[in-house]
């Protein structure tokens, strides 16, 4: 019994000092916000009018493995890791909707961008596909937030719905200062702006007779 006393005291001391604590660090939650640097990226519309009339943001889809809150970290050995201590404040598909909408508002080709819940009739709907939303740590000493986005403008008037315009853009921002809200906000804003600049008409094959 006497031999167990020192061990018991050692365990109590370790517990008091925190070295046996099982409590994990509290995760830090980060946002993706509308960038203050966002500006009109639209090419001049012929005749000075708008190209898309009234629109709304439709579905926002995020490819795996970027579709969950934990950051996806790209590593130098080609693998990815999931950072459970730096996470997005919500699922990325929900978090990106407002920044994308606000970017469309700043694009002169859209006459009006209504809220998702609006009952207003729209001429088009913008579908969003995110194919990259990662923290790139492949270069020693560097952390870079990356984003890649494809926008499909779907006409919603009479007749069959189809993709009328499509564009893809990428963005990156230095994240070495650890401010991931700023870094991912800038990367996403650049990617969406690039996709808007790249919008091109989608040619559809004529229906078979």
Range-by-range predicted roles:
Residues 57, 100, 128, 149-151, ...:
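Buried hydrophobic packing residues in well-ordered domains
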Residues 60-62, 76-78, 131-133, 150-156, ...:
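Solvent-exposed coil/turn segments that connect beta secondary-structure elements
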Residues 86-107:
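Structured, soluble extracytoplasmic/luminal domains of envelope-associated proteins
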Residues 1-19:
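Sec-dependent bacterial lipoprotein signal peptides
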Residues 101, 105-109, 135, 196-204:
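Sec-exported extracytoplasmic/periplasmic mature domains
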Residues 20-39, 107-158:
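Surface-exposed short loop/turn segments
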Residues 79-87, 157-197:
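Short secondary-structure boundary motifs at beta->alpha junctions and helix caps
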Residues 19-93, 203-209:
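A structural "domain/chain start" motif
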